[in-house]
């Protein structure tokens, strides 16, 4: 919501600015992004008008909660920008169920950032690496490489927190990197130090399998042999079974999966 132009704000009034319509791929302050063209002026002006200025931000996809949500490269930039423009606090609307992506990592990083919004980028990524090492064990570097790769693959598009997978990623680009994505997670699983670490790796891998299976669907159905199609269907079945095994919420609306092994996961 744009701030008023001809009146002030009462000192007892609290303003919560919602970012739901903005781009989660670009920094909010990037006015060249078509989804963020108004937020810079709005945040700056509200910060000048209102003492009790807060932000309602987002860090998950409520419609497609198991698709990758690659916003790690803008979290710190956005939080520091809010702080510099008079925001007094942030309510982060995130995943509330068992995460099939990186919900735990985001919770940790957001806690650190909100305690110290002026931390350096080097400190931020040191916190990330510390968590990854603790949560994913010896194979954490493969998970970090995957995170960096998905940030890169999602940079082609501008997307909101309710965007479909095809609105976040170019499926052709993801398909071209499918082998690399799978190899990184295979390596992370192989390096798991314990059963609990392996479970963490496998649960977080669900989002990777989800986007790969969604991205390669058209090519497999159009050009694949019958054996390749059967292998695709079997992988979908395995993915569905893993969702049930780890009790991962399909989306934040508590809707059940409309599973079909013959359809890409983004259509379930």
Residue ranges and their predicted role:
Residues 1-47, 57-58:
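Gly/Pro-rich turn-and-neighbor structural signature
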Residues 113-268:
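Catalytic domains of carbohydrate-active enzymes that cleave complex glycans
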Residues 34-141, 145:
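Structured mid-domain segments that build the active-site/substrate or prosthetic-cofactor binding neighborhood
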Residues 16-19, 25, 59, 75, ...:
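Catalytic cores of glycan-processing enzymes that make or break glycosidic bonds
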Residues 18, 56-58, 89-95, 246-257, ...:
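A generic structural motif
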Residues 14, 54, 264-268:
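Generic structural signal for residues positioned in beta-strands
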Residues 7-8, 28-31, 68-70, 105, ...:
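Surface-exposed beta-strand edges and their flanking turn/coil or helix-capping segments
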